[in-house]
């Protein structure tokens, strides 16, 4: 995936002395093998064949850089992944979820909203695109009180601009299939498929759906 090249490019734009490639790689390993906090992930990496040569503070410092360069990292990983295996990007799936924080006061993007776990805590919303094989393509994080339907256009616009991906069928559940989102995915060489409840369909439409 040429993560080394990605990290070299990032370092040219930032002033830091730690090894971003080593930190990013170890965080991915830890997330797959033993998902936990950054502190626990750092401790876990100490048990690997090649333990970290960076400090825990370096991990914390790198997080702001990774967050700032998130869009660049995602687009480069997508482009580089095509060298390993051609991505099936003719169909893209989009969905949202949210994450809660065990805090009481709102701050930044952590806002009170409708938690999917029915938690009374501030949350953030994450929107994620996957390709037809279920491999993640791009994601972004939004304020927890933002309507999920409005998260689509900004992220899809990034895909159109940065991923060189403009001919696909957009698929989502009915909750993300607003008129504005359907209209947006009728432009260019895009189309859409939105799930729809049979119970809410008109009788004639339901008969066609059940007997195509």
Regions found by a protein language model. Name each.
Residues 148-212:
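An internal, acidic/charged active-site-proximal segment
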Residues 125-127, 191:
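Generic structural signal for residues positioned in beta-strands
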Residues 1-108, 120, 129-140, 145:
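Dynamic "connector" segments at or just before major functional cores
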């Amino acid at each position: 995936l040429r993560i080394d090249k990605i990290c070299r490019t990032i370092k040219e734009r930032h002033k830091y002395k730690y090894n971003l490639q080593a930190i990013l790689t170890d965080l991915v390993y830890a997330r797959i093998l033993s998902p936990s906090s950054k502190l626990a992930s750092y401790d876990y990496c100490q048990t690997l064949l090649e333990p970290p040569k960076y400090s825990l503070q370096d991990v914390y410092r790198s997080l702001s850089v990774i967050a700032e360069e998130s869009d660049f990292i995602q687009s480069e990983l997508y482009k580089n992944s095509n060298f390993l295996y051609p991505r099936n990007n003719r169909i893209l799936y989009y969905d949202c979820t949210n994450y809660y924080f065990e805090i009481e006061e709102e701050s930044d993007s952590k806002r009170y909203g409708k938690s999917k776990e029915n938690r009374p805590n501030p949350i953030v919303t994450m929107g994620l695109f996957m390709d037809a094989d279920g491999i993640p393509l791009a994601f972004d994080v939004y304020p927890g009180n933002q309507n999920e339907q409005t998260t689509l256009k900004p992220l899809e616009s990034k895909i159109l601009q940065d991923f060189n991906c403009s001919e696909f069928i957009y698929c989502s559940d009915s909750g993300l299939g607003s008129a504005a989102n359907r209209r947006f995915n009728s432009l260019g060489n895009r189309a859409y498929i939105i799930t729809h409840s049979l119970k809410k369909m008109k009788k004639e439409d339901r008969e066609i759906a059940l007997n195509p």
